[in-house]
Each structure stands twice: as structure tokens, then as C-alpha cells.
Amino acid sequence: MNKVLITKLIIVTFLLSTSAFAANNHASNEWQIDAYSSAAPSFIGDFATIIGGNGEVIRKGSNGWTCQAGNPRPFPKNGWKDVHEAMPACSDKEAVKWMMAYMAGKKPQLDNDGWMWMLHGDVGEDNLKAGVLNKKDSTPGQWIESGPHLMLMPKDPSSLDNMNADFSNGAPYVMFPKTIWAHVMIPVNGYYKYQKESEPIK
């Protein structure tokens, strides 16, 4: 009887330790699924396909949306240090096309406008010039480390040519204006938490 009880305790301890390891192992499928799916509201993220850091599907979805890390830097061996660094994005099928084209340095070919959620924000972009990964290399005054936001990827980026490009007034604005990657940034609550100095002042 005691042997059975001890065996059960060993099994439970093993399962709990394995679960805790997976939760703390940022390269694990479990961590990535939880982190990337939370880039969108749960009614989208919970049913989306999840792409892991090595490019493989780690969970097949059912709603046509795809969530994955948006950080263009190489996937670290031990995973991203936190969900903000991962820059996860949840995209509809048109926004997936946009992301793939952007990562490849090509012009997006969309059938219609696309939508992308990034509720954990990003680690910083030059608002005027695509592909700048460090603040020191950015256009003066144009670096923005975003908090939670939604993005609209237009089929025709030139339709945004006359749109506001100022990220400091709280309104939706265009990022990468007058380029093939122009898109609308729609700030939501908490957008300025990583860059307080850009928040509108009362």
C-alpha cells in the first residue's frame, strides 16, 4: 500500500515539475502557444493556428487566423526572454501575406485589406523607415516602442499617403508612410507604456 502511494507521489511530482519546466521554458511549445495566442483577444487567439519559433505549426487552428512571433531577429536557443520581446502577432490570411512579404523585403500582394493584432506591442521601430532594429540607427524623433495595438494592412498602401504619421497624438497613424509597407497603427489602452515620453499630454 505504501509502495503504491509513494509511486503515485513520485508520478505527481514528476508531472508537476515537467509542467513547471514547460511554463518556464520559453522555447517550449506550451509557452509559445500561450504567448503568441495572447497577441489577440481570446476569441481570436484561442482558435488560431500557432507557428513556433522554428517555423513549424505547433497548434492547428480553426478560424483562419495565425499567431506567431513577429520579432525579425533569429529565434533564441532558449526562446524569447518575455512575450514583449517575442513581439507576437495574430494575423488574418491577408495580413499573413503582408508579414511574409515584409520579412522577405518584397511588395505585399493582397486580395483585400488585412488585420493584425499585437497586444504585447513591439520592441521598437523607426516609424518612417522599415527594417531599422536599433534606436541609434533610427530617424531622429521617429523611434517608437509600441504597446498594445491593432494594425490595418491596406491592399493599396498609397491610399494612406495623406494620413497622419504622428504617433504621439493618440490617434491611429500610418507607419512607413509612402512606402510599399505603409500600414495603419491603431493604438489601444496601454500603447505608451514602454515609451511614456511619446504619450499625449493633458
What are these regions (language model features)?
Residues M1-I10:
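Bacterial N-terminal signal peptides that target proteins for export
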Residues L9-S17:
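Bacterial N-terminal signal peptides
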Residues L5, F14, N25-S28:
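Intrinsically disordered, low-complexity Ser/Thr/Pro-rich tracts
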Residues N2, A20-F21:
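Hydrophobic alpha-helical packing segments in soluble, helical-rich domains
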